[in-house]
């Protein structure tokens, strides 16, 4: 449940973005043909814009017929921060040597749409004028060759734009491209360092800035504490009233309750944290229970609410997971469900009914439920601070994906597992944290063995908004290894893929 009255500069709306639609042809066919190419390619762009599957505005560009125009268009796309990618279609034959400079310079994600204007052949009327005009079957093969020759990462979507599967795939790629755009400009604020002696939350922040674009920097938690303790009483009053309006607040935390001051302090944390992140221009952050300085509580509900408003978050200094949470928030914008930091905590191992119970100390995003969370206060046995306030809820049932990002020394590795989030078998009256229960695909034993074999992290992002296909496109755009665990996974094949990937990425990195 995101705060409906708060508008953040780090918003997740896809309306700020656009994708350029590029059509390839050549002057060989004459001006009349080029006019038809322009008209029909505009119709294709309009059809994409008319589909509810396509979340980002498609902007048609004039037909490209020579290398200079292609090169200039690529450079213009690179320079425009609102452009998150380009879609290319060769309506006629467009000699691919014209595309070499432009493709070599292009730094935005590329989708190759292999389509044509007509659905059916006009059997009785077809002549060679029709063949010259409608030869994407010919032109796109030339374009595919030069992309492969140059080693250009791209997604290829095949079919007529009236086919819902075509628009669905275009939309998936657009969402992945939006996530990439968000990461490329992401500023991430760390309060304190990583949890001591933990391995997987470490990583090369300089390499991450090179590979992903994200800028990861650290501030003293006492600078945050100063912002928290400087929150105005009137702002605290307003925010506490909002809590009582939006959530089911337990009586002891309400005005007049024995622990109302703890709720007010949680509101101070939220106000200070928001103001600090806004001043930094940060859309993601981390905290650590081992480094709380002058803060009286480990940030709990404040973190949950900031995640609900689109911020990325990682616990215990885990900046890599904060990146994933931010990307997932943007990629899932406008879709039902949510995305959150998650951690595999414990198992239900009844034979044939195995499940994973995921949670964290406090920080699970309420976007994972459509129900009204309950605001509670309970002791926290680590951190040495006052009892923290948190929202408690069960994640809604439905399909999802859990994704981890690990630093493997010579590269970053994404690992994604398709899951089914399920209802709790029984209530959990003594577990005072938000949680999710899921059945991993293809089954528990294969999933866990593959996850461990891959060296995947114990912190993840759980998304119930987007599926595996969005993360596959994201990894392709990011040129980052992705290992998928789903219905088709076997350990034998998974181990082979790990070995192949080790050879491929080491060779590719050295070329």
From Swiss-Prot:
Alphabetized Pfam families for the sequence: AraA_central, AraA_N, Arabinose_Iso_C
Organism per entry: Arthrobacter sp. (strain FB24)
Recorded family membership: Belongs to the arabinose isomerase family.
NCBIfam families named among the record's database cross-references: PRK02929.1 (NF002795)
Protein name: L-arabinose isomerase
Any GO MF annotation of the entry: manganese ion binding
A GO biological-process term: L-arabinose catabolic process to xylulose 5-phosphate
EC class (word): isomerase
Cofactor section: Mn(2+)
Keyword Manganese: yes
